[in-house]
Design a protein with these regions (language model features):
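Short, surface-exposed alpha-helical recognition segments that flank or form part
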Residues: 4, 198, 324, 359-367
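A mobile, often basic/glycine-rich helix-loop segment
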Residues: 327-358
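Active-site catalytic pocket residues across diverse enzymes, especially alpha/beta-hydrolases
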Residues: 47, 244-248, 379
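Conserved Class I SAM-dependent methyltransferase catalytic core
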Residues: 29-42, 207, 353-393
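Generic recognition of stable, solvent-exposed alpha-helical segments in well-folded globular domains
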Residues: 4, 8, 12, 38, ...
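Non-catalytic, mostly N-terminal accessory regions of nucleic-acid modification and defense proteins
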Residues: 1-215, 284-288, 292, 299-302
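Glycine- and acidic
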Residues: 18-21, 160-164, 188-194, 224-226, ...
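Conserved S-adenosyl-L-methionine
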Residues: 196-318, 323-328, 332-336, 393
Length: 393
């Protein structure tokens, strides 16, 4: 996609807020509507070609009383998501009655697979449906995102002569648009915690280079595992993935990457998951480890609710929050601030040569050291390159 086309697409989506939501919603609420609707429309157009097959397969599975339907429906769509409702966003916009549109939209949302629903819930889209309906903005939002003036599909829009009218939107560009919208919304509303969510791309490339460049000539044709225990919107994971593959390709290596992360802020977690979903960086959000079903991007506090317990990685790259007390993690373990010594977790203790236990637990105000200890616990000693850790402090 050319820069002018990118700018036009970005401006169209950005202006939906000022065209439709202005006066009806506070500016701080814009991203809670625009971002999930953009994700839904992207997914919606990807699923359109297999819509009839999915509904037919769903009916057949129900008829034969098959409970575990998700893997079969994923196979039909070719994506790690599906929608079993009778609606698409295009067909939704034909309803002119506000209340019926609301009910149809809810049915449409409920038809999505678990990971899309997870994103919808964490981004709090359902909480604004009533307001969108009462202000008669729901239909307008849907109309804007299904407009013929934009194309969120991965295939170009052609005119009657077969000429390209609108370019295809590839996964990478889709992810870039999403991240840029998120950044702009936060800047417009002076989001003070944005530093917790974003690590500039140049910084991330530097982090990746620090991790990989010293051993770049030793990279092999294999799969490497990257972990970020404070992954925010996932920027470090995706950019580090790109950089490692790029450095490998320059040396004639065919490298694949598996990414693992954890985030506790619901909107940031959902943003990470949505970005990975629409950018095509991940083909399944669940994996099996030791007979346990786990999430590649886990939800919850890394410090007290380890979503990747016992696992080790090739690269641990992160920019954890700073100046944030970890006393809430004590509370989650049923402990008071004065009971820090009772916070038991094998990640935060080591044995010295005399088998004496040494605690890594820092002061309550220093969660960065906790994240560093967590990364150290992920180190592996059964591979030629071991584990490379790069963490911002």
């Amino acid at each position: 996609m050319e820069q002018a086309q990118y700018n036009s697409l970005f401006s169209f989506i950005w202006n939906i807020a000022t065209d439709v939501l202005v006066y009806a919603f506070d500016k701080s609420e814009y991203k809670k509507i625009i971002l999930p609707m953009m994700v839904l429309r992207r997914i919606d157009v990807l699923l359109e070609p297999t819509k009839k097959q999915v509904i037919s397969m769903k009916e057949n599975l129900d008829k034969n009383h098959i409970d575990n339907q998700a893997p079969i429906l994923y196979n039909v769509t070719g994506y790690p998501f599906y929608n079993t409702s009778k609606f698409t966003m295009k067909t939704l916009q034909s309803e002119i009655d506000a209340q019926r549109l609301k009910m149809n939209f809810i049915e449409y949302l409920n038809g999505y697979s678990r990971d899309v629903l997870d994103i919808v819930e964490k981004l709090h889209l359902r909480q604004v449906i009533d307001n969108l309906t009462e202000t008669e903005r729901l239909g307008s939002i849907i109309e804007k995102f299904t407009s013929d003036h934009i194309n969120l599909s991965n295939k170009p829009v052609l005119d009657d002569e077969g000429n390209e009218k609108l370019p295809a939107l590839d996964n990478h560009t889709m992810g870039t648009v999403f991240e840029e919208l998120l950044r702009r919304f936060n800047e417009e509303n002076n989001v003070t915690e944005a530093g917790e969510h974003f690590t500039p791309r140049d910084y991330v490339k530097l982090l990746a280079d620090l991790a990989v460049q010293p051993i770049a000539d030793q990279l092999q044709d294999t799969t490497y595992r990257i972990y970020d225990g404070a992954c925010g919107t996932g920027g470090i994971l995706t950019i580090a993935q790109e950089r490692i593959k790029e450095l490998g390709a320059k040396r004639g290596k065919n490298i694949t990457i598996s990414i693992y992360g954890q985030e506790q802020a619901p909107d940031t977690y959902a943003t990470c998951k949505a970005d990975l979903m629409i950018s095509g960086e991940i083909h399944s959000f669940q994996y099996n480890e030791g007979g346990l079903q786990r999430e590649y991007i886990a939800y919850g506090s890394t410090l007290s609710q380890d979503g990747h317990a016992g696992e080790t990685y090739d690269f641990c790259i992160s920019n954890p929050p700073f100046g944030t007390p970890w006393k809430e993690d004590l509370k989650k373990r049923g402990l008071k601030e004065t009971e820090k010594a009772k916070f038991t977790d094998s990640r935060f203790t080591i044995l010295d040569k005399d088998e004496n236990e040494i605690s890594f637990l820092p002061d309550i105000s220093d969660c960065q050291m906790m994240f560093l200890a967590n990364n150290i616990s992920r180190m592996q000693d059964d591979t030629p390159l071991g584990t490379r850790i790069v963490e911002v402090h």
